[in-house]
């Protein structure tokens, strides 16, 4: 059965093939295996980490709604949140903005968003590239590269049965699944007038909340493309999750024609970051994170394999 995401033009299996090609081409190019949230090289007694990511097709909705600034925040968030997942503290970044034609208003608002995101993440934007490329770009494309530093990388190897899994509330859809969302809008199944403002909410920046307690955390997973299937990166043990009731925008997307289980393979469903912690540190970590974040106790790690998700409809999904 063809997934709704593939019908929208995003073939996750093909992306896996491309990841494998990159892995085979650039093997042994970093400390971690290519395909993790980020990678790093050894630099004296520390690790220099680097990550690149973009906003994707959310920019198309940005132009349609006129809500541009959040995409600048998205660009920062997608990078710093992934860097912190390998135990790195983000330091600085550069941006790449490609335009179909001169767009003064877009450039100004993107830069404001980038500045706001950088301030929230406590990083500096130290350079970038702006290009006008008619015939190559339609609208605009936005991406960033961010570097970070770490004394000890987090690979997930410390995760063990009995560990507790926490979830941090998302700010909405964030920056993934927009090709499918646009398809639903184009087909008249989802109203941009009703949901445009909600769909343009920026990706939440978690790094500044997490960094002060990074040494107490065993592993982290930023819920982006591939959604909860990416938890397989963290551990080979069985992951058990009971998901909370998601924000209404996800129910609207599901009601527009996306199968219930597929929602958890594409969207964050209200949880933007997952954190693995020791049971004895759980309460202290929840207390600290709750100062800035909405924290859910989602589940636990046990012996076995795979991912078991109890959805908000109390249906069981195995990944």
Swiss-Prot record:
InterPro entries: PurM-like_C_dom, PurM-like_C_sf, PurM-like_N, PurM-like_N_sf, PurM_cligase. Its EC number is 6.3.3.1. SUPFAM superfamilies: PurM C-terminal domain-like, PurM N-terminal domain-like. Coiled coil: none annotated. GO terms for molecular function: ATP binding; phosphoribosylamine-glycine ligase activity; phosphoribosylformylglycinamidine cyclo-ligase activity. NCBIfam families: purM. This is Phosphoribosylformylglycinamidine cyclo-ligase.
């Amino acid at each position: 059965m063809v997934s709704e995401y593939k019908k929208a033009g995003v073939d996750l299996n093909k992306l896996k093939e491309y990841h494998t090609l990159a892995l085979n081409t650039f093997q042994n190019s970093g400390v971690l295996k290519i395909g993790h949230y980020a990678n790093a090289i050894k630099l004296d007694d520390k690790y220099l980490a680097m990550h690149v990511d973009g906003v994707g097709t959310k920019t198309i909705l940005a132009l349609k709604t006129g809500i541009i600034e959040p995409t600048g925040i998205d660009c920062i968030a997608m990078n710093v949140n992934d860097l912190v997942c390998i135990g790195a503290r983000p330091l600085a970044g550069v941006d790449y903005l490609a335009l179909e034609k001169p767009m003064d208003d877009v450039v100004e608002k993107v830069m404001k968003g980038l500045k706001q995101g950088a301030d929230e993440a406590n990083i500096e934007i130290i350079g970038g590239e702006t290009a006008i490329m008619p015939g190559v770009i339609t609208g605009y494309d936005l991406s960033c590269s961010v570097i970070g530093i770490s004394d000890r990388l987090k690979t997930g190897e410390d995760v063990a049965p009995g560990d507790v899994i926490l979830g941090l509330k998302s700010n909405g859809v964030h920056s993934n699944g927009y090709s499918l969302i646009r398809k639903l809008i184009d087909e008249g199944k989802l109203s941009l007038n009703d949901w445009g403002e909600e769909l343009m909410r920026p990706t939440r920046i978690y790094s500044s909340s997490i960094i002060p307690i990074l040494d107490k955390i065993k592993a982290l997973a930023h819920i982006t493309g591939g959604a909860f299937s990416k938890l397989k990166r963290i551990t080979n043990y069985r992951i058990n999750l009971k998901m909370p009731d998601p924000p209404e925008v996800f129910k609207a997307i599901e009601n527009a024609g996306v199968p219930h289980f597929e929602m958890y393979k594409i969207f964050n469903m209200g949880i933007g970051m997952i954190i693995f912690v020791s049971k004895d540190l759980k309460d202290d970590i929840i207390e600290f994170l709750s100062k800035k974040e909405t924290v859910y106790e989602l589940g636990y790690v046990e012996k076995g394999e795979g991912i078991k998700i109890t959805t908000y409809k109390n249906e069981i999904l195995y990944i």
